[in-house]
Amino acid sequence: MQETDNLLKTLNVKSLLEALLVYTPKGYKDLNLLERFETGLSGVLEVGILEKRNYAKVLKIFAYSKRFYKNLELVFFNYSAFHHSQFKTGESLFIYGKLEQSSFNQAYIINTPKIITKFGKISLIFKKVKNHKKIQENLQKLISLENLKKEGVKENIAHLLLEIFFPTPHFVKDFETNKNFPSQHLNALKYIEMLFYMKNLERKKLQFGAKIACPNNNERLKAFIASLPFKLTRDQQNAIKEIQNDLTSSIACKRLIIGDVGCGKTMVILASMVLTYPNKTLLMAPTSILAKQLYNEALKFLPPYFEVELLLGGSYKKRSNHLFETITHVVIGTQALLFDKRDLNEFALVITDEQHRFGTKQRYQLEKMASSKGNKPHSLQFSATPIPRTLALAKSAFVKTTMIREIPYPKEIETLVLHKRDFKIVMEKISEEIAKNHQVIVVYPLVNESEKIPYLSLSEGASFWQKRFKKVYTTSGQDKNKEEVIEEFRESGSILLATTLIEVGISLPRLSVMVILAPERLGLATLHQLRGRVSRNGLKGYCFLCTIQEENERLEKFADELDGFKIAELDLEYRKSGDLLQGGEQSGNSFEYIDLAKDENIIAEVKRDFLKAASVSRGTFEN
């Protein structure tokens, strides 16, 4: 055990699985003597040096193979005196290289051969590593069938991994021929990568006692739902039921609720507050606009006996004298909540809205502030960014996850991909909608001019709109007053020129047109969020994707689909799997081998094996 720990420390990794992924060989150097004199083979030859010739910047050393009685040329480009000194006429030595044949004179050649003093083994080649030899020694001490089994690796997978890290000449030849590992070995690496990911998730699944187990507020919940002027969807009801079970538990819950744009997650948030009553709820939103929006929704829909407070950065001091008093049932705020020094012991539930907009440390800090004597508050994290089914499959055993797919009011949004020459179509529709007292947002790819991007910037394009329309507002992420600008636009504006800062959560009831410039530069998830701002209150909506590209299959497919969960699947076809991971859950924040779009069977296999092993170790597995 001590030896294993020392080896892991030397390799700067925390587990054998991590070592397998960090130090997967990127190639091999077969230092065995060549068995055949055949082009395309790499290996060691014993050669005798016959003569040397200089050709401009090329040094040719004429030699012969002592074993195969064949002449060959050793070629160095941009050679130096060092190469002359290494290869002396009349001497014999061992060299490593790849045997090739010249297309000019059919001579056998080895380009840039290396002199070998020790041979008879296969060296592993690692990416971005200095001491290859030492790392290989430590790895091969660490990796064994026994150690792999201890990590939960199945025997058939373990044998494939052993072939990767203890390769035979035949295996190396296959690797060089295919320029990659054979498919079964690649699948073994995928298995290990997903197993490593799941083990990391399991480490985060620590159970703590709930600081406060909430009462069963079934009657109060029924009254709240009955008071709403609309009917909840089946998905909303299921989410509320799952949360109700969580809140009454003596174990602190941590649940991720993922909903599509416009799925009505705000009503689920408010129902959670009702279920927590008379205990307190703390809700953190990423921006003042969203916090105010949630605050107004709470005032509108929560029962009149609820006392709701709002804490923003600007109003922090003003409200600090009476905020968090016993009478308050719900506190809604921004990151200003993280800097409040008051005792949060009475808060039974902590909610984070648009959770992906916060770092892991920020979410943890809020939870920690509301913890007491080792017991934690219940925690709900809401996100309006759907994730692919395969990623949900991997997470579901370790993170309680609820999906809200149904949309209360199906949106009527027409999405068109247009070339800049067709911009007159956009202008006509904008004029029509403004005449109806509707609103328009134009999203620019960047704030200031850039030679690298063939589109106008926000600052360059503003004058175009200001000359043609009234009530044009401009803002960006760099604007200190952006939230005030957006609020003023919501009340009295016609056109808002902005960057993607308006991507998430903001409710603009009169917004009917979204124009996105350079949409090819944005991920489909971002495009879906932007489009989701349109048609919030039953208006017919229009989303124009304005590009300089003649064709873009990705954008055309996006235009034909409104379902955020299907778009998340579509996104996998065009993005690396790692782009969908957030919060540093997987080393390097990306999967190198697993393809979330294609490897559902492997993910399901790993999950099944992992849960079976875990239940056996607890003595709870049943056949």
Swiss-Prot record:
GO terms for molecular function: ATP binding; ATP hydrolysis activity; DNA binding; DNA helicase activity. It is an enzyme of class 5 (isomerase). One of its GO terms (biological process) is DNA repair. The wedge domain within the N-terminus inserts into the replication fork junction, where the lagging and leading strand split. Belongs to the helicase family. RecG subfamily. Plays a critical role in recombination and DNA repair. Helps process Holliday junction intermediates to mature products by catalyzing branch migration. Has replication fork regression activity, unwinds stalled or blocked replication forks to make a HJ that can be resolved. Has a DNA unwinding activity characteristic of a DNA helicase with 3'-5' polarity. This is ATP-dependent DNA helicase RecG.
